Amino acid sequence: MTDNFFHGARVKENTDLQTAINDVDSTVIGLVAVADDADATTFPLDTPVLITRVISVLGKAGKTGSLYKSLKAISDQVSTRVIVVRVAAAGTEDGAKTQSQLIIGGSQADGSYTGMFALLTAEQKVGYRPRILGVPMYDTQEVTAQLRVIAKQLRAFSYSYCDGCETIAEAKTYREQFAEREGMLIWPNFIAYNSVSGENEEFPAVAYALGLRAKIDNEQGWHKSLSNVAVSNVLGITKDVFWALQAEDSDANELNANEVTTLIKRDGFRFWGNRTTDKDEYIFEVYTRTAQILADTIAEAQFTTVDSPLTPANVKDVVSGINAKLQGLVTAGRLIGAACWFDIVDNPKTSIPQGKAVVRYNYSPVPPLEDLTMIQTFTDQYYEAAFASLGGA
């Protein structure tokens, strides 16, 4: 008699399911801000801090610099996770670092990161990767340029102001300094009530863009652009911007034609503009964000697949799982179309024994309906039918 004799019935469970591909969280904001009077325990310098309920820390954000105004603008739009990196205000003594130097930061001798570079460590330190980046009120040209490098490394998208620009012409000229797909330029700023000072003050439009972007992702999806969505709790715009829906020669249209997003008032205040500073393929904000979020969604889902046996069955499961996810996004209206496949040309017999496999997928993102033309025709074709009933009367 064998040792494993059994007289009866038993069930051994296994699964035959594709690995589920979950969406990455696209709503996490990465904010770099200045506030010397902020609570140092809540907001330590040069350290990514996860805030899960922004409104609860407004009282600790101080009154100076940009931290309070930025968090207030974000919280007026959405309740979302915000990763805050607070940097010191620049000193006035000789040899002191400039504010832009402190905000940009870098890698220190001990290997630690300061300034916006601290955002690179956020995922390891607080468990979330920032996807929506901004440095409201301090986004000078050099800060914006470096922020876009950080955005590329994080597969994130950045929003920046046309720093120092007082006119439309200056904003158009400023825009020419940038060419990346990872950023949108905004001009001018909003006016809002500051409950701390009791005055109506200029508030950074970039901070509102960060909050509104997260709100749109939550309510509609990352395939919907920032443009033409009402912004909460603003009272005005800091510069005169002529806009009319049908006006081809408006200020807003001129700014948009030069890839600068502007602000308008119609049924409340809104951002108006869809464009990045890339003039080639990733011309729309949603094109860049779709590419980023799709890439991370597909790649991160393969964590448990890496180092599994490289068999035809496992590769087939990878392809099937990706196709299922892509078709789900198509059905949800977040992609126009998409497909994944295994091509033997990409996988020669010399590669498989080395533990290497390649699968391909493509997709068509959803463009914004930016230019709608309706053809109106004056015709006489309806007269006869309209008056035919009067015949013989």
UniProtKB/Swiss-Prot annotation:
One Pfam short name: Phage_sheath_1
Compartments where found: Virion
GO cellular component terms listed in the entry, alphabetical order: virus tail, sheath
Keyword terms of this UniProt record: Viral contractile tail ejection system, Viral genome ejection through host cell envelope, Viral penetration into host cytoplasm, Viral tail protein, Viral tail sheath protein, Virion, Virus entry into host cell
Highest taxon, organism lineage: Viruses
Main subcellular location: virion
Biological process annotations from GO: symbiont genome ejection through host cell envelope, contractile tail mechanism
InterPro entries registered for this protein in UniProt: Gp18_domIII_N (IPR054564), Phage_sheath_subtilisin (IPR035089), Phage_Tail_Sheath_Structural (IPR052042), Tail_sheath_C (IPR020287)
PANTHER family: PHAGE TAIL SHEATH PROTEIN, PTHR35861
Similarity comment text for this entry: Belongs to the myoviridae tail sheath protein family.
Function: Forms the virus contractile tail sheath.
Protein name per the record: Major tail sheath protein
